[in-house]
Amino acid sequence: MESDNLQDPQEETLTCSICQSIFMNPVYLRCGHKFCEACLLLSQEDIKFPAYCPMCMQPFNQEYINDISLKKQVSIVRKKRLMKYLNSKEHKCVTHKAKKMIFCDKSKILLCHLCSDSQEHSGHTHCSIDVAVQEKMEELLKHMDSLWRRLKIQQNYVEIERRTTLWWLSVKLREEVIKRVYGKQCPPLCEERDQHIECLRHQSNTTLEELRKSEATIVHERNQLIEVYRELMTMSQRPYQELLVQDLDDLFRRSKLAAKLDMPQGMIPRLHAHSIPGLTARLNSFRVKISFKHSIMFGYTSVRPFDIRLLHESTSLDSAETHRVSWGKKSFSRGKYYWEVDLKDHEQWTVGVRKDPWLRGRSYAATPTDLFLLECLRKEDHYILITRIGGEHYIEKPVGQVGVFLDCEGGYVSFVDVAKSSLILSYSPGTFHCAVRPFFSAVYT
């Protein structure tokens, strides 16, 4: 490795502490430690949040800064080492005692100007060492960039690697909620409850097996990319004089094949919305008419600074979208209430309740602990349902009306797919003990 040749103490600062070689695309963290960008990200094998600095273990949440100045220093030092090597006595042509400043691409060797004119090499392609180094590095970096972009894209799917656990927890939570809902039905529907739970468990086990297969495919694909990328990176860090004489055709061939592999997307698990007999009929006994105040705002941050999306950073929102926010004219602190919100014309929306008062002076600011909402957001080519508890909920997106059931005494709110008379999800009893106000927000594109 090129780091083995470091002698100048100043040049020791150009060595990555992870790969123990000269920096490639150096970055630095807030704690001050510097690494190759690839070394830093690939060292986080579990892709945990927050991620930690490999040196001091301070969290950095995948936030780092490209060190342009250090990158320039690295380039200068590498060229300096090459010239030192070319000017050394050991490097001179044995036959002509001249410097070897010409590269023969056919033979992959360095030549002096007299050897390059010889009959042996007369039909070969020659160029100066500077040009050869530049072309070789450009080709290496081109392959590295192609694989790195694929690895970065795969980071959008890192949650898939832990989705099996999230799925299992989501199903267990849903099972408890379903039991609680059936327990409130009158008369108790024990047989229907057991059938519902059995169906849920069967779907859960089937999906879990598919998730594991999907996970294995993604991990295998990622490991293939990482293996080839590490080979390219190791080669790019070698001294220029060694890099030139290497035959990289096989490595470049494998790099192209790896870059063309189908990108596994991972499956998107969803639980079917099973009907609960008598659910909507029971909730309609608490039906109230909710009057809303309306406000139209432009831009996401001005509407929802509490940002539920913190649970899912990869969710994309268009800055040109318009968010219409509505909140109930009346707050509730006692009793049970049920209302429905028509969402058939909205693809992205938020429904639920939030702590009263809604307005704090003239500010719309709220903290996540003030909010008891169900939010539907677009994520790439599909939609997800999330709450501030439990993150993503793997339930089919409701089409049409969503029912909201508020139990002030119980301190929770539930959401219902009206068309299917099925439970979407429910907050746990005792989640809040305060007056709350109905809330609704929709996105207009």
From Swiss-Prot:
<dbReference type="Pfam" id="PF00622">
    <property type="entry name" value="SPRY"/>
</dbReference>
<dbReference type="InterPro" id="IPR003877">
    <property type="entry name" value="SPRY_dom"/>
</dbReference>
<keyword id="KW-0479">Metal-binding</keyword>
<dbReference type="InterPro" id="IPR013320">
    <property type="entry name" value="ConA-like_dom_sf"/>
</dbReference>
<dbReference type="InterPro" id="IPR013083">
    <property type="entry name" value="Znf_RING/FYVE/PHD"/>
</dbReference>
<dbReference type="Pfam" id="PF00097">
    <property type="entry name" value="zf-C3HC4"/>
</dbReference>
<feature type="binding site">
    <location>
        <position position="93"/>
    </location>
    <ligand>
        <name>Zn(2+)</name>
    </ligand>
</feature>
<feature type="domain" description="B30.2/SPRY">
    <location>
        <begin position="270"/>
        <end position="445"/>
    </location>
</feature>
<feature type="binding site">
    <location>
        <position position="96"/>
    </location>
    <ligand>
        <name>Zn(2+)</name>
    </ligand>
</feature>
<feature type="binding site">
    <location>
        <position position="115"/>
    </location>
    <ligand>
        <name>Zn(2+)</name>
    </ligand>
</feature>
<dbReference type="GO" id="GO:0008270">
    <property type="term" value="F:zinc ion binding"/>
</dbReference>
<dbReference type="InterPro" id="IPR001870">
    <property type="entry name" value="B30.2/SPRY"/>
</dbReference>
<keyword id="KW-0863">Zinc-finger</keyword>
<feature type="zinc finger region" description="RING-type">
    <location>
        <begin position="16"/>
        <end position="57"/>
    </location>
</feature>
<feature type="binding site">
    <location>
        <position position="121"/>
    </location>
    <ligand>
        <name>Zn(2+)</name>
    </ligand>
</feature>
<dbReference type="InterPro" id="IPR017907">
    <property type="entry name" value="Znf_RING_CS"/>
</dbReference>
<keyword id="KW-0862">Zinc</keyword>
<feature type="zinc finger region" description="B box-type">
    <location>
        <begin position="88"/>
        <end position="129"/>
    </location>
</feature>
<dbReference type="InterPro" id="IPR000315">
    <property type="entry name" value="Znf_B-box"/>
</dbReference>
<dbReference type="InterPro" id="IPR050143">
    <property type="entry name" value="TRIM/RBCC"/>
</dbReference>
<dbReference type="InterPro" id="IPR001841">
    <property type="entry name" value="Znf_RING"/>
</dbReference>
<protein>
    <recommendedName>
        <fullName>Tripartite motif-containing protein 43A</fullName>
    </recommendedName>
</protein>
<dbReference type="InterPro" id="IPR043136">
    <property type="entry name" value="B30.2/SPRY_sf"/>
</dbReference>
<comment type="similarity">
    <text>Belongs to the TRIM/RBCC family.</text>
</comment>
<dbReference type="InterPro" id="IPR018957">
    <property type="entry name" value="Znf_C3HC4_RING-type"/>
</dbReference>
<dbReference type="InterPro" id="IPR003879">
    <property type="entry name" value="Butyrophylin_SPRY"/>
</dbReference>
